[in-house]
């Protein structure tokens, strides 16, 4: 990365109008550069003499002219975010003052920071591991408190510690195996099959637990695309409005009111749903409404893209051919059947047994009266796995980490199978080495430059 050993600066707060704008400066000449453009209010104060973890009030100067009141926060190396000398300068929010401050710093010798360059320096200077660096953007992008807690657990180093325990156990096993094979004259105790396979099985189970929790963790952090499907006038838009908490979609007794997809993000329990209310799905003949037909095609297309399906049925009417077609299309997907209009249901109730083969969950509701909302909330959390997930526990937080953990798990499975099928310890040792290499890739201990660049290409400037 360019400027890795220069002094850099960037806006650390969102651009535009706001209460304050904060510019971060990091590098070996941070104090010298800021000293050129910062004038303390109190006589006798200077940037050069400022101690770490202190603040100073002053004004910043642009081409010698006093521009705006400014608060400087000082961090001395190595006790800073990047491990370098860091100064954070806060001025009044707004583009003009922030841009003026950046211009002053760059004129005085700072280089503009690239995306993620502050965190990259923290990694280079040993302030955080690669998994912690990845967690930085996860914390920023997290949706909901539990998603943020999950990302923060990785930022706090819990994932690195959990992977470290697995690595230590496997390295100890590998060292024993290597000593026994390579130095027979040293009278190293023989490694029994039970002990060898037992350790591999235990650590494989630990990786299985991490891998199995990835999808639910991703849902907590980023939310899930959820499509509302059903034939016309079953109450999809009423359900959307209930979940949104306001009248987002038009609701009328006229079937087919919704023609195009209506989008709305909502928080349902601990899960953020990116809802898509679709046109009612039904068979439209060749001479039918072309606009409605296009809306239905889009509805079916959305089904293929969704991470969660809420299939809505009118509980007061028998299942129609269109209902059964919807049920068949939902089979094998993360789908919940919502039996709406329970207040009108009587002898014509939809038989649950007819729908059970197609849906993992069935929830009776009356969306108009908000009846069954908690049951739907619980069903969504249970189906997506977030109900069982501990947000304080260490979890994988990127596709890269998942791929590395999967490689390690698969290598351990091969090592176990090798011994169980009568292959020698040398064959199992190769698989064990592969597993350790995958774990080193995960934590970043042996990460290539390409891997590190891949991690930081998603970062924003200022972080």
Where are these regions (language model features)?
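A glycine-rich (often HGG/GG-containing) alpha/beta subdomain
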Residues: 1-149, 153, 336
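Switch I (G2) and immediately adjacent beta-strands of P-loop GTPase domains
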Residues: 57-67, 72-76, 256-287, 305
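Hydrophobic alpha-helical scaffolding
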Residues: 91, 251-252, 296, 313, ...
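Glycine-rich, N-terminal phosphate-binding loop of Rossmann-like dinucleotide-binding domains
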Residues: 26, 91-93, 243, 278, ...
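Inter-motif core of Ras-like GTPase G domains
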Residues: 292-316
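C-terminal-of-GTPase-core extension/linker across diverse P-loop GTPases
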Residues: 2-11, 15, 145-267, 273, ...
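Structural motif
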Residues: 275, 310-312, 338
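Gly/Ser/Thr-rich helix-start
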Residues: 17-20, 28, 84, 94-95, ...
